[in-house]
């Protein structure tokens, strides 16, 4: 009897695993793909939609563009996973049976119990989120004046927060909109935990774009018009975007899989506490010893290739590969500019300019080409 492998999620981890699984299984098992949407979002470029909604067509890849005809796709939100029955529950009440499952559900925004943060902030986790930010910023800019500009606040100065602030600055400048932008970070410096040279390069470009940066002052509360801090005066705002962290999806709460804050624990071969369930991406915490993988697109891409191979090997009773994360550097955009750091083979540690911008565009285009086609990537190139 043919076995069934079910992949949950259409983010970088899920979509990448589908491509890898199709390649390595070679028709030896049935593949079922379950996801909330009938598309994969190129999330690390979704901030472009904030400035220009027309970009959505470039960052939205339909599942039929990605999967082979033999892979069955089911649109639905996962509500539970029963390892005893080997069943996945969906929001419409249906279930999907599996012999092996890969959890690649991504993450949701973490609010850390800060009062009012969930209720009064926008997030950037989906295409609809990016479109909502665009509309809210446009509306606020329309109501602002040079004497009383609209205040746009981005909370969290990690990758997503920096890129979001940069894109809002491009929106402002391209439309000469009366907007001031604030980027907030609770820790001592923007892009926390990274190389000081990279942090300095990013800060320089943000300041050049007229973005006001505040660090080392955590948010303690938010209401419908102001943000409150550990010290100092409240900051009144018109639009508040929160990008300050991630946590696991609630649908895994009742699962018996070992997890930490709903992120499933997995070994370096991606097997979880249940032999028939594997996990990768933001929904997983992979045990890599002293070098944990970051919750980034780069890590998800790498893991997806090995996870697909391992699931195919598991169905054949073969020994599984162990994944080792390879840091291939960091690429971040600040509007039309970009900063690159730690790129293998490049003697300069941190650099910007056309070379950094070209590298960032190239990475996005390569992912789109790998998922769909070179032609699709070429059409998306101007929007990256």
What annotation goes with each model-predicted range?
Residues 3, 29, 86, 100, ...:
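Nucleotide donor/acceptor-binding cores
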Residues 6-8, 96-108, 235-246, 304:
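Short hydrophobic core segments
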Residues 72-80, 173-265:
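A Rossmann-like FAD-binding core segment of flavoenzymes
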Residues 119-148, 225-226, 234-302, 309, ...:
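FAD-site-proximal beta/loop scaffold in flavoenzymes
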């Amino acid at each position: 009897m043919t076995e069934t492998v079910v992949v949950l999620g259409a983010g970088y981890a899920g979509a990448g695993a589908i491509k890898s699984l199709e390649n390595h299984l070679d028709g030896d098992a049935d593949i079922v793909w379950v996801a909330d949407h009938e598309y994969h979002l190129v999330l690390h470029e979704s901030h472009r939609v904030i400035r220009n909604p027309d970009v959505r067509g470039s960052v939205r890849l339909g599942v039929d563009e990605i999967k082979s005809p033999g892979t069955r796709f089911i649109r639905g939100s996962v509500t539970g996973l029963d390892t005893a029955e080997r069943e996945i529950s969906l929001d419409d009440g249906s279930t999907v049976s599996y012999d092996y499952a890969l959890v690649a559900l991504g993450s949701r925004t973490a609010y850390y119990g800060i009062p009012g943060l969930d209720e009064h902030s926008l997030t950037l986790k989906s295409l609809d989120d990016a479109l909502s930010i665009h509309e809210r910023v446009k509306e606020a800019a329309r109501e602002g004046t040079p004497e009383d500009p609209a205040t746009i606040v981005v909370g969290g100065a990690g990758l997503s927060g920096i890129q979001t602030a940069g894109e809002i600055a491009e929106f402002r400048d391209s439309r000469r909109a009366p907007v001031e932008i604030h980027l907030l970070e609770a820790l001592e410096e923007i892009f926390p935990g990274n190389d000081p040279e990279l942090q300095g390069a990013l800060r320089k470009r943000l300041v050049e774009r007229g973005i006001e940066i505040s660090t080392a002052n955590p948010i303690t509360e938010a209401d419908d018009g102001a943000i409150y801090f550990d010290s100092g005066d409240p900051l009144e705002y018109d639009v508040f975007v929160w990008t300050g962290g991630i946590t696991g999806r609630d649908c895994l709460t009742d699962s018996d899989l070992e997890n930490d804050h709903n992120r499933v624990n997995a070994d370096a071969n991606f097997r979880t506490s249940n032999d028939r369930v594997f996990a990768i991406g933001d929904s997983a915490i992979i045990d890599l010893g002293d070098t944990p993988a970051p919750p980034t697109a780069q890590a998800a891409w790498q893991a997806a290739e090995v996870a697909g191979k391992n699931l195919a090997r598991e169905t054949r009773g073969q020994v599984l590969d162990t994944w080792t994360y390879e840091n291939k550097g960091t690429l971040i955009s600040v509007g039309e500019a970009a900063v690159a750091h730690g790129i293998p083979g490049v003697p300069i540690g941190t650099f910007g300019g056309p070379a950094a911008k070209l590298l960032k565009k190239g990475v996005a285009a390569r992912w789109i080409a790998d998922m769909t086609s070179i032609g699709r990537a070429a059409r998306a190139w101007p929007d990256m």
